[in-house]
Design a protein with these regions (language model features):
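TRNA-recognition modules of translation machinery and tRNA-sensing kinases, especially anticodon-binding
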Residues: 69-71, 81-84, 88, 186-529
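N-terminal alpha-helical targeting/anchoring segments
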Residues: 2-195
């Protein structure tokens, strides 16, 4: 009978894969997540953290991880304790070996009927054996206790190290205020005419109003079927979504990015390895997990809905070795994304700007981390930005590019740039207590900007947690590659921006960007039926 390559999950869970290329974790839960033997074993850079504890502590403060600021010094303490335990174990282990040899000789002497006693207490062989065995057992108990404590220290060191955010790049502004890099399709000296419209006129320019009137959006039905945070795209609205996806994919393919259709469900430990936590710093739910029955909770790893295709695209190479000749690896994938968005308030909750389920096209790349690598992760980061700016410029959306501050980087990124578009519907939320304006010259527009894309460098943060390595390429040792990721198209937000910025009130139509028309049956505008 022919054998297939299929192995059931329970067998995989009990069978350790035999490979010299990758070590996997044990089945012990890590941070309350069941991890099977096939799960990638994370490898934090404990040595670098231990040697630069002050740097990591300050980085935690800069990045809003204040509760983690004590972890680096704790890692130092635990490392010293583990080192001392390792030293202290040498004496009892050596003594145990001596005792075992002596005990063996006494056993032989006893069987041969000779007197093998060498003790000064003039004990009988049986008495000496009992005494030696007692000492050996005591030393073994002490050794076991120290060994277990050392293992506990090592486990705690890894847990603390893995909880730390990535170090921020030299380009990253420290604090909470981003830095303006440039504008796209926007002149600060001549802002759009709608910026001078009344609140009533701005309300008429909202994508909710436009989309409902032109029968592109249906929030009434979604309120019945699913609730807040969902929507129906109908008629030309549904066509616009597909046009945006195809335009983003075609742009990426033209630049040599490989198309992937990824799953939208992953193991929860995979999402965590990529830097996505179930709850944010305010304990608000961010990721939806698939409910398990009581029997499965202790036998099967939990799964989660992905908030971005970044997670499954990164996981494609989890636990694998890449040859340097394979790099760079450039992937683009369209997927449905799911976000809890707990704690959202105000204008963000209206319409398409902040929703629970949406379509997004994501870019993800791997670059060699060795010095002099071509392309480097910085090169790929710049390629991502160029692509994002090309897409948004062609869509005729007024945008600004921001270098994001340390307080907005999350856990995995060392550097992040966001691109924000102008939304007329968000301008009406302006208030005197708004955040510090990025451009004081047009401070009154600050609330109207909304993020539509993001690009990040994660250095080796994700590859260390996903156990992905690079070999070859002139370097003797394997190393952890760098990862970059970015949004090619966040459909709901870009669609909303097109409706609001492309609205022609006099004609009662939305002008369709020229680059989308091939996927819109050649339509130039969407108007009233």
């Amino acid at each position: 009978m022919a054998l297939t390559s299929y192995i059931c999950f329970n067998c995989r869970n009990s069978y350790r894969l035999k490979t010299s290329l990758r070590n996997f974790s044990t089945t012990r839960p890590y941070r309350d997540l069941l991890r099977p033997a096939t799960a990638p074993k994370p490898t934090p850079d404990v040595k670098h953290i231990r040697q630069n504890a002050d740097l990591y502590a300050q980085n935690c403060i800069d990045r809003n991880y204040v509760a983690h600021a004590g972890h680096p010094s704790k890692i130092q303490q635990l490392s010293e304790e583990a080192r001392q335990l390792d030293h202290d174990l040498k004496t009892p282990r050596s003594r145990i070996k001596q005792l075992e040899k002596t005990i063996a000789k006494l056993h032989i002497a006893t069987r041969q009927g000779t007197d093998g006693n060498t003790n000064e207490k003039d004990l009988s062989p049986s008495e000496e054996l009992a005494e030696l065995k007692s000492e050996a057992q005591r030393l073994k108990d002490d050794s076991q206790s120290m060994t277990e404590r050392k293992a506990t220290c090592t486990e705690e060191i890894n847990r603390l190290a893995l909880s730390l955010p990535n170090l921020s790049s030299p380009f990253t502004p420290i604090g909470h205020d981003p830095t303006l890099v440039q504008y796209l399709n926007f002149n600060a000296q001549e802002p759009p005419t709608w910026t001078r419209q009344s609140p009533t006129e701005l309300q008429a320019r909202s994508h909710v109003t436009i989309g409902t009137e032109l029968k592109l959006l249906d929030f009434t039905s979604s309120a019945t079927t699913t609730g807040w945070g969902w929507y129906f795209l109908i008629n030309e609205g549904a066509m616009l979504e597909q046009a945006l996806v195809q335009y983003a994919l075609s742009t990426a393919r033209r630049r040599g990015w490989k198309t992937v259709a990824p799953p939208s469900i992953v193991y929860s430990y995979i999402a965590e390895a990529c830097g996505f936590q179930p709850r944010d710093a305010h304990n608000e739910q961010q990721i939806w997990s698939i409910e398990q029955n009581e029997r499965d909770k202790n036998t099967k790893p939990q799964r989660s809905l992905t908030g971005t295709a970044e997670i499954p695209l990164a996981a494609m190479y989890a636990g694998r070795d890449m040859n340097a000749s394979e790099l760079p690896i450039k992937l683009v994938g369209a997927s449905r994304c799911y976000r809890a968005e707990a704690g959202s308030r105000g204008v963000d909750t209206k319409g398409l700007y902040r929703v629970h389920e949406f379509t997004k096209v994501e870019l993800f790349g791997w670059a060699d981390s060795v010095d002099g690598a071509v392309p480097s992760s910085d090169d790929m980061f710049n390629e991502l930005l160029d692509m994002q700016m090309e897409i948004l410029t062609a869509l005729n959306l007024p945008c600004r590019v921001l270098e994001m501050p340390s307080g907005d980087l999350g856990a995995s990124a060392t550097r992040k740039r966001d691109i924000e578009a102008l939304f007329p519907s968000r301008l009406r939320a302006a208030s005197g207590g708004a955040a510090t304006p990025v451009d004081p010259e047009i401070h009154y527009l600050e609330s109207a900007w909304g993020e539509v894309t993001s690009a990040s460098i994660c250095t080796d943060y994700q590859s260390r947690r996903l156990a992905a390595r690079v070999r070859g390429g002139g370097a003797k040792e394997s190393r952890f590659p760098h990862t970059v990721n970015g949004t090619a198209m966040a459909v709901p937000r870009v669609l909303a921006a097109i409706l609001e910025n492309g609205w022609d009130a006099e004609r009662g139509v939305v002008v369709i960007p020229e680059v989308l028309r091939p996927w819109m049956d050649g339509m130039e505008s969407i108007g009233r039926s």
